[in-house]
Amino acid sequence: MTQCNGFLGGQLLIAMPGMNDKRFMRSVIYICAHSDAGAMGIILNQLHHIDFPELLLHLGVIDSGQKKCLSEPIKQFPVRYGGPVDPSRGFVLHSDDYACEETVFIADKVCFTATIDILKAISCEQGPQHALVALGYAGWKAGQLEAEISTNGWLISSTSPSFLFESDLSCKYDKSLTRMGIDPTYLASEMGHA
Protein backbone atom coordinates (compact mmCIF):
# COMPACT_ATOMS: atom_id res chain seq x y z
CA MET A 1 0.00 0.00 0.00
CA THR A 2 1.32 3.43 -0.91
CA GLN A 3 0.46 6.81 0.54
CA CYS A 4 -0.79 9.74 -1.51
CA ASN A 5 -0.98 13.09 0.19
CA GLY A 6 -0.47 16.61 -0.96
CA PHE A 7 -2.26 19.80 -1.81
CA LEU A 8 -6.02 19.05 -1.90
CA GLY A 9 -5.85 15.25 -1.66
CA GLY A 10 -8.59 13.98 0.66
CA GLN A 11 -10.68 17.16 0.32
CA LEU A 12 -14.03 17.80 -1.36
CA LEU A 13 -14.65 20.08 -4.30
CA ILE A 14 -18.18 21.45 -4.40
CA ALA A 15 -19.32 23.02 -7.66
CA MET A 16 -20.45 26.62 -7.42
CA PRO A 17 -23.87 27.48 -8.91
CA GLY A 18 -22.18 29.23 -11.83
CA MET A 19 -20.45 26.04 -13.00
CA ASN A 20 -20.82 26.15 -16.79
CA ASP A 21 -19.75 22.58 -17.51
CA LYS A 22 -22.96 20.51 -17.31
CA ARG A 23 -20.99 17.38 -16.41
CA PHE A 24 -20.03 19.02 -13.12
CA MET A 25 -23.13 21.06 -12.18
CA ARG A 26 -24.03 20.46 -8.51
CA SER A 27 -21.15 17.98 -8.28
CA VAL A 28 -19.36 16.95 -5.13
CA ILE A 29 -15.92 15.54 -5.98
CA TYR A 30 -13.51 13.74 -3.68
CA ILE A 31 -9.92 14.62 -4.61
CA CYS A 32 -7.86 11.42 -4.67
CA ALA A 33 -4.59 12.96 -5.84
CA HIS A 34 -3.29 16.49 -6.37
CA SER A 35 0.21 17.65 -7.24
CA ASP A 36 2.07 20.10 -9.46
CA ALA A 37 1.30 17.73 -12.36
CA GLY A 38 -2.51 17.95 -11.95
CA ALA A 39 -5.38 16.46 -9.99
CA MET A 40 -7.68 13.46 -10.04
CA GLY A 41 -11.00 13.00 -8.26
CA ILE A 42 -14.20 10.98 -8.17
CA ILE A 43 -17.67 12.55 -8.47
CA LEU A 44 -19.60 11.31 -5.44
CA ASN A 45 -23.17 12.30 -6.23
CA GLN A 46 -23.90 11.06 -9.76
CA LEU A 47 -25.13 7.55 -10.50
CA HIS A 48 -23.90 5.64 -13.54
CA HIS A 49 -26.46 4.00 -15.83
CA ILE A 50 -24.91 0.53 -15.30
CA ASP A 51 -25.74 -1.45 -12.17
CA PHE A 52 -23.14 -3.36 -10.15
CA PRO A 53 -24.09 -6.90 -11.30
CA GLU A 54 -23.91 -5.78 -14.95
CA LEU A 55 -20.52 -4.19 -14.31
CA LEU A 56 -19.24 -7.41 -12.72
CA LEU A 57 -20.57 -9.42 -15.67
CA HIS A 58 -19.09 -6.99 -18.22
CA LEU A 59 -15.65 -7.16 -16.56
CA GLY A 60 -15.73 -10.96 -16.35
CA VAL A 61 -15.71 -10.97 -12.54
CA ILE A 62 -18.82 -13.18 -12.56
CA ASP A 63 -20.74 -15.14 -15.18
CA SER A 64 -24.50 -15.03 -15.80
CA GLY A 65 -25.09 -17.98 -13.46
CA GLN A 66 -23.23 -16.29 -10.62
CA LYS A 67 -25.15 -13.07 -11.23
CA LYS A 68 -28.34 -14.79 -10.06
CA CYS A 69 -26.64 -15.86 -6.82
CA LEU A 70 -25.48 -12.41 -5.72
CA SER A 71 -26.94 -11.23 -2.43
CA GLU A 72 -29.57 -8.52 -2.50
CA PRO A 73 -27.26 -5.83 -1.03
CA ILE A 74 -24.70 -6.58 -3.76
CA LYS A 75 -27.39 -6.48 -6.46
CA GLN A 76 -28.41 -3.03 -5.18
CA PHE A 77 -24.83 -1.72 -4.76
CA PRO A 78 -24.69 1.60 -6.66
CA VAL A 79 -22.14 2.42 -9.34
CA ARG A 80 -21.25 6.09 -9.60
CA TYR A 81 -20.32 8.16 -12.61
CA GLY A 82 -16.87 9.17 -11.42
CA GLY A 83 -16.19 11.66 -14.20
CA PRO A 84 -15.61 12.04 -17.94
CA VAL A 85 -12.00 10.80 -18.07
CA ASP A 86 -11.43 7.08 -18.80
CA PRO A 87 -15.18 6.29 -18.42
CA SER A 88 -14.80 2.54 -18.93
CA ARG A 89 -12.27 2.14 -16.10
CA GLY A 90 -13.39 1.27 -12.58
CA PHE A 91 -12.18 2.93 -9.40
CA VAL A 92 -13.01 2.10 -5.79
CA LEU A 93 -12.80 4.49 -2.86
CA HIS A 94 -12.98 2.45 0.31
CA SER A 95 -12.31 2.17 4.02
CA ASP A 96 -8.83 1.17 5.16
CA ASP A 97 -9.87 -2.31 6.32
CA TYR A 98 -9.02 -3.65 2.84
CA ALA A 99 -5.64 -3.31 1.18
CA CYS A 100 -3.63 -4.93 -1.57
CA GLU A 101 -0.32 -4.00 -3.14
CA GLU A 102 -2.01 -1.51 -5.50
CA THR A 103 -4.06 0.23 -2.78
CA VAL A 104 -3.26 3.89 -2.20
CA PHE A 105 -3.96 5.46 1.20
CA ILE A 106 -5.44 8.93 0.63
CA ALA A 107 -6.44 10.39 3.99
CA ASP A 108 -8.40 9.80 7.19
CA LYS A 109 -9.05 6.06 6.77
CA VAL A 110 -9.88 6.42 3.05
CA CYS A 111 -8.12 4.36 0.39
CA PHE A 112 -8.25 4.02 -3.37
CA THR A 113 -7.90 0.78 -5.35
CA ALA A 114 -8.40 0.22 -9.08
CA THR A 115 -8.13 -3.57 -9.49
CA ILE A 116 -10.46 -6.40 -10.43
CA ASP A 117 -9.57 -8.09 -7.14
CA ILE A 118 -11.39 -5.52 -5.02
CA LEU A 119 -14.51 -5.89 -7.18
CA LYS A 120 -14.34 -9.67 -6.70
CA ALA A 121 -13.99 -9.17 -2.95
CA ILE A 122 -16.97 -6.79 -2.83
CA SER A 123 -19.11 -9.17 -4.93
CA CYS A 124 -18.36 -11.99 -2.44
CA GLU A 125 -19.01 -9.68 0.53
CA GLN A 126 -15.36 -10.00 1.56
CA GLY A 127 -14.32 -6.50 0.57
CA PRO A 128 -13.98 -3.36 2.64
CA GLN A 129 -16.72 -2.42 5.08
CA HIS A 130 -17.34 0.81 3.16
CA ALA A 131 -16.83 1.20 -0.57
CA LEU A 132 -17.78 3.47 -3.42
CA VAL A 133 -17.43 2.07 -6.96
CA ALA A 134 -17.16 4.53 -9.84
CA LEU A 135 -16.57 4.39 -13.58
CA GLY A 136 -14.41 7.21 -14.88
CA TYR A 137 -12.85 10.09 -13.01
CA ALA A 138 -12.51 13.86 -13.07
CA GLY A 139 -9.05 15.01 -14.09
CA TRP A 140 -7.22 18.33 -14.30
CA LYS A 141 -3.89 19.08 -15.95
CA ALA A 142 -1.21 21.11 -14.19
CA GLY A 143 -2.63 24.40 -12.90
CA GLN A 144 -6.12 23.80 -14.30
CA LEU A 145 -7.86 23.06 -10.99
CA GLU A 146 -6.15 25.98 -9.29
CA ALA A 147 -7.36 28.27 -12.09
CA GLU A 148 -10.93 26.99 -11.75
CA ILE A 149 -10.85 27.55 -7.99
CA SER A 150 -9.48 31.08 -8.39
CA THR A 151 -12.30 31.95 -10.82
CA ASN A 152 -14.96 30.86 -8.31
CA GLY A 153 -15.69 27.48 -9.92
CA TRP A 154 -15.31 25.37 -6.80
CA LEU A 155 -15.58 25.50 -3.03
CA ILE A 156 -13.14 23.38 -1.03
CA SER A 157 -14.22 21.49 2.07
CA SER A 158 -12.90 18.86 4.41
CA THR A 159 -14.84 15.63 4.69
CA SER A 160 -15.12 12.52 6.82
CA PRO A 161 -15.34 8.84 5.90
CA SER A 162 -18.93 8.69 7.17
CA PHE A 163 -19.96 11.53 4.85
CA LEU A 164 -17.93 10.19 1.95
CA PHE A 165 -19.52 6.73 2.07
CA GLU A 166 -23.05 7.93 2.88
CA SER A 167 -25.36 6.32 0.33
CA ASP A 168 -27.95 9.10 -0.15
CA LEU A 169 -26.74 10.80 -3.33
CA SER A 170 -29.73 13.10 -3.82
CA CYS A 171 -28.83 15.35 -0.86
CA LYS A 172 -25.02 15.17 -0.97
CA TYR A 173 -24.58 18.53 -2.71
CA ASP A 174 -26.80 20.44 -0.27
CA LYS A 175 -25.39 18.54 2.72
CA SER A 176 -21.85 19.40 1.61
CA LEU A 177 -22.71 23.08 1.66
CA THR A 178 -24.62 22.84 4.94
CA ARG A 179 -21.63 21.13 6.58
CA MET A 180 -19.65 24.27 5.66
CA GLY A 181 -22.29 26.51 7.23
CA ILE A 182 -23.64 27.63 3.85
CA ASP A 183 -27.36 27.71 3.12
CA PRO A 184 -27.61 26.47 -0.50
CA THR A 185 -30.53 28.82 -1.20
CA TYR A 186 -28.30 31.84 -0.57
CA LEU A 187 -25.27 30.70 -2.54
CA ALA A 188 -24.72 33.02 -5.50
CA SER A 189 -22.94 32.16 -8.72
CA GLU A 190 -21.24 35.57 -8.95
CA MET A 191 -18.57 36.77 -6.57
CA GLY A 192 -18.31 40.37 -5.48
CA HIS A 193 -15.42 42.66 -4.71
CA ALA A 194 -15.31 45.42 -2.11
Curated annotation (Swiss-Prot):
Q: Which domain of life is it from?
A: Bacteria
* A Pfam family this chain is assigned to: DUF179
Organism, as annotated? Bartonella tribocorum (strain CIP 105476 / IBS 506)
Family in the record: Belongs to the UPF0301 (AlgH) family.
Q: What is the lineage of its organism?
A: Bacteria, Pseudomonadati, Pseudomonadota, Alphaproteobacteria, Hyphomicrobiales
Name of the protein described by the UniProt record: UPF0301 protein BT_0659
Q: Which HAMAP family match?
A: UPF0301
Instruction: Give TM segment ranges.
Output: none
Gene Ontology CC entries for this record: cytosol
